[in-house]
């Protein structure tokens, strides 16, 4: 039986993507070769990379607007240092919003390159809310934020307006909701939350912001070099890029980001409504900052933990325990999560009510 996968990542992908990818593992494009063994320079894979890069920009509404899409390696953790390496001037500074664990990790890397101003932080309340009302220094080389926080279940609902370049880590909510993506100058997202398997990272960057900070950048960390090499400066993660393309095609076939967002809202509303209705549970995040991707919640009485755990496991649910730094539970309801699976969890929460 296929389980209801609530893992925060690597995470659920569409069933049809699994099916197409599994066929490609045996015979890709009737080539007689597996996708795992084809040359990354072959015309078949070059076509995959080109379409993936183009489709990413199309879905984000950024085609013809001076942006380039790249599929790189190293995850968002490498992007944490690539941003300052490519954008922070010598003796410059950057502004960061500290809204969670991954924002903190990005800040740590930025401090290696220059002054790093933390414009706002929710660390004082274990990151249960998104900081607001902060000021971004006009003389900063860029502003960095994390759109969604997988661990704490918070999500930025309104992004600040500023005249300096805006960098955003969208690893866990990329392609999940409509935004004016032209307000961002650099977006990066590890594939393993909402787009594909671990092994590749989508980078979307406005070309005009590159090459201005005067630094000598190592080749593998230089966005401009990756653009010039058409995302093939070194051997890319062929399979991860291919599966990401299949997922992007699935999003387009669904009706694009607008259609996906509508379903995501319905799933989140269904689950949060039960959390708020059921006296046995409480949400972990500030209500106005609740994530539509990672729903964090707690039992009001820890004595019910054993019973609840037995119920959701018996229902075929996987990956529900919360991160160790928060505890409780975390239901990751990414794009590919069907609303039927969310209903299963809601039914389990109601069943607990009748048992205690």
UniProtKB/Swiss-Prot annotation:
It is found in: Cytoplasm. Its EC number is 2.6.1.52. The gene is serC. Belongs to the class-V pyridoxal-phosphate-dependent aminotransferase family. SerC subfamily. It catalyses: O-phospho-L-serine + 2-oxoglutarate = 3-phosphooxypyruvate + L-glutamate; 4-(phosphooxy)-L-threonine + 2-oxoglutarate = (R)-3-hydroxy-2-oxo-4-phosphooxybutanoate + L-glutamate. Keywords: Amino-acid biosynthesis, Aminotransferase, Cytoplasm, Pyridoxal phosphate, Pyridoxine biosynthesis, Serine biosynthesis, Transferase. Pathway: Amino-acid biosynthesis; L-serine biosynthesis; L-serine from 3-phospho-D-glycerate: step 2/3; Cofactor biosynthesis; pyridoxine 5'-phosphate biosynthesis; pyridoxine 5'-phosphate from D-erythrose 4-phosphate: step 3/5. This is Phosphoserine aminotransferase. It comes from the Bacteria. It is an enzyme of class 2 (transferase). L-glutamate binds at residue 41. Its cofactor is pyridoxal 5'-phosphate. GO terms for molecular function: O-phospho-L-serine:2-oxoglutarate aminotransferase activity; pyridoxal phosphate binding. One of its GO terms (cellular component) is cytoplasm. It comes from Flavobacterium johnsoniae (strain ATCC 17061 / DSM 2064 / JCM 8514 / BCRC 14874 / CCUG 350202 / NBRC 14942 / NCIMB 11054 / UW101). Homodimer. Catalyzes the reversible conversion of 3-phosphohydroxypyruvate to phosphoserine and of 3-hydroxy-2-oxo-4-phosphonooxybutanoate to phosphohydroxythreonine. HAMAP family: SerC_aminotrans_5. Pfam families: Aminotran_5. The modification N6-(pyridoxal phosphate)lysine is found at residue 193. GO terms for biological process: L-serine biosynthetic process; pyridoxine biosynthetic process.
């Amino acid at each position: 039986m296929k389980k209801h996968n609530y893992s925060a990542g690597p995470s659920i992908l569409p069933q049809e993507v699994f099916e197409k990818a599994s066929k490609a593992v045996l015979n890709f494009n009737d080539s007689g070769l597996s996708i795992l063994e084809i040359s990354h320079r072959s015309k078949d894979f070059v076509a995959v990379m080109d379409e993936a890069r183009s489709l990413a920009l199309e879905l984000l509404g950024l085609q013809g607007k001076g942006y380039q899409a790249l599929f790189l390696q190293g995850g968002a953790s490498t992007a944490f240092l690539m941003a300052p390496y490519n954008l922070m001037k010598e003796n410059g500074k950057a502004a960061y919003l500290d809204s969670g664990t991954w924002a903190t990790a990005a800040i740590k890397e930025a401090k290696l390159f220059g002054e790093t101003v933390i414009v706002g932080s929710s660390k004082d309340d274990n990151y249960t809310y998104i900081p607001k009302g902060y000021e971004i220094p006009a003389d900063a080389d860029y502003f960095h934020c994390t759109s969604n926080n997988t661990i704490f279940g918070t999500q930025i609902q309104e992004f600040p307006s500023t005249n300096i370049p805006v960098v955003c880590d969208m690893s866990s909510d990329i392609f999940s909701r409509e935004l004016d993506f032209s307000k961002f100058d650099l977006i990066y997202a590890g594939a393993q939350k909402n787009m594909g398997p671990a092994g590749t990272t989508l980078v979307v960057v406005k070309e005009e912001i590159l090459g201005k900070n005067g630094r000598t950048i190592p080749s593998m960390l230089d966005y401009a070099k990756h653009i010039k090499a058409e995302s093939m400066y070194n051997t890319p993660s062929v399979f991860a890029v291919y599966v990401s393309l299949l997922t992007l095609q699935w999003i387009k076939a669904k009706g694009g980001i607008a259609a996906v967002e509508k379903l995501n809202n319905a799933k989140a509303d269904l689950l949060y409504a039960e959390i708020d209705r059921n006296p046995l549970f409480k949400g972990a995040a500030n209500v106005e900052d609740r994530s539509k991707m990672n729903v964090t919640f707690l039992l009001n009485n820890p004595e019910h933990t054993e019973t609840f755990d037995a119920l959701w496991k018996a229902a075929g649910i996987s990956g529900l325990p919360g991160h160790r730094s928060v505890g409780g539970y975390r239901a990751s309801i990414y794009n590919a999560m069907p609303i039927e699976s969310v209903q299963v969890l809601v039914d389990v929460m109601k069943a607990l009510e009748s048992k205690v």
